């Protein structure tokens, strides 16, 4: 039996890397003989769609811009509504908490 830590390390690392190599080879063999692998058929070529006309493209762009403007207006209105509801909730909370006369702590 040896007490040399370098020799023990080399033996351990040889065993570890040997096991890893064997597992890697086993994985390659399993992938090569995999019975559950689906058979890939020939892929059909993708047919390119014709380009839309300039008028249709312009109309689609206008519709997109209008939709974006509507969404932005809606979001702005929602933000205002949320801010108003939050302000009302804070005011209601303050109104309910004032009569309790809780001690104020200063840290």
Curated annotation (Swiss-Prot):
Keywords: Cell membrane, Decarboxylase, Ion transport, Lyase, Membrane, Sodium, Sodium transport, Translocase, Transmembrane, Transmembrane helix, Transport. GO terms for biological process: glutamate catabolic process via 2-hydroxyglutarate; sodium ion export across plasma membrane. Residues 37-60 are annotated as: Disordered. Part of the primary sodium pump glutaconyl-CoA decarboxylase (GCD). Possible membrane anchor for the alpha subunit. One of its GO terms (molecular function) is sodium ion transmembrane transporter activity. Coiled coil: none annotated. This is Glutaconyl-CoA decarboxylase subunit delta. Pathway: Amino-acid degradation; L-glutamate degradation via hydroxyglutarate pathway; crotonoyl-CoA from L-glutamate: step 5/5. It is an enzyme of class 7 (translocase). Belongs to the OadG family. One of its GO terms (cellular component) is plasma membrane. Its EC number is 7.2.4.5. Pfam families: OAD_gamma. It comes from Acidaminococcus fermentans (strain ATCC 25085 / DSM 20731 / CCUG 9996 / CIP 106432 / VR4). The chain crosses the membrane at residues 10-32. The lineage of its organism: Bacteria, Bacillati, Bacillota, Negativicutes, Acidaminococcales. It is found in: Cell membrane. The gene is gcdD.
